[in-house]
């Protein structure tokens, strides 16, 4: 097993708002994906499936609710997570943990997204 995690889903209440938020702070495109469930909106983060990269999505459906409780998803903060973190507030989120040094493991930070989820960033710089 190369990765303990291979997929994550972040629940959202407003798909378009969340898609814009994550696209803005991470400077990437969330790709709309058709799911057979008619009452579901699904948008995938880019990932390298050929090299067993970890992927994920934002999901709007009634059975999934945004939360600050539970597991924390750590998104790739790039070379320096301050770049993404600096966009959180202007994109509609709230920084709840600034860039924090975790020794040889790099840096982490946490924020509340536009949907009310507690999400984190990780980078080595």
Language-model features: where?
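Core segments of cupin and vicinal oxygen chelate
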Residues: 2, 9-53
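Residue-level preference for short coil/turn positions at secondary-structure junctions
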Residues: 1, 54, 67-69
């Amino acid at each position: 097993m190369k990765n303990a995690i291979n997929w994550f889903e972040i629940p959202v209440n407003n798909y378009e708002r969340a898609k814009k938020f994550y696209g803005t702070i991470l400077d990437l495109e969330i790709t709309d994906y058709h799911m057979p469930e008619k009452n579901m909106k699904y948008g995938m983060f880019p990932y390298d499936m050929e090299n067993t990269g970890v992927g994920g999505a934002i999901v709007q459906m009634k059975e999934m609710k945004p939360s600050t409780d539970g597991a924390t998803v750590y998104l790739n903060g790039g070379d320096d997570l301050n770049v993404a973190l600096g966009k959180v507030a202007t994109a509609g989120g709230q920084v709840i943990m600034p860039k924090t040094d975790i020794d040889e493991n790099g840096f982490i930070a946490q924020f509340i997204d536009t949907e009310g989820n507690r999400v984190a960033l990780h980078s080595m710089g």
